[in-house]
Amino acid sequence: MMISAIDPRIKVASVSGALNLLQERMTLRHSCGSQIIPGLLKYGDYSEIGSLIAPRPCVWETGSTDPLIVPKWDEVFRDRLRKAYKALEASDQLHFDRFEGGHEWSGRVAYPLFDKVLKG
């Protein structure tokens, strides 16, 4: 997500198992802390970083049994992404995939999208 947000050479992105907000991560006891960027909340949250990918195509995927994805918070994240893509008239470039599985990579939506964007 981070490099896709800042490097315009990246034409398409996929982010897996990361629909988390810093404000949520900081309150969970089982969070290891490696996701915490000091001072980020002064400017925004991970959803704002993810929004920088717009208007480029991006798939956000989560496993249905991923214990690190908190349903209430992942919907807040999704809503923020939707607003950013809509503001750039790129709603059709934002994709979500909730697959059967845990905290893992799926690619079932990402691979076809990458082929479409990169191979034409």
PLM features per residue range, with description:
Residues 3, 8-21:
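A conserved short beta-strand
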Residues 5-9, 76, 114:
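Short, solvent-exposed amphipathic alpha-helical segments in soluble enzyme
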Residues 7-8, 55, 89-91:
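Short, well-ordered coil/turn elements that cap or connect secondary structure elements
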Residues 11-12, 56-59, 95:
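Beta-sheet entry/capping signal
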Residues 16-17, 61, 99:
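Alpha/beta-hydrolase-fold catalytic nucleophile elbow
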Residues 21-22, 26-80:
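The feature captures the conserved acid-bearing segment of alpha/beta-hydrolase catalytic domains
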Residues 79-120:
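C-terminal catalytic histidine-bearing segment of alpha/beta-hydrolase fold enzymes
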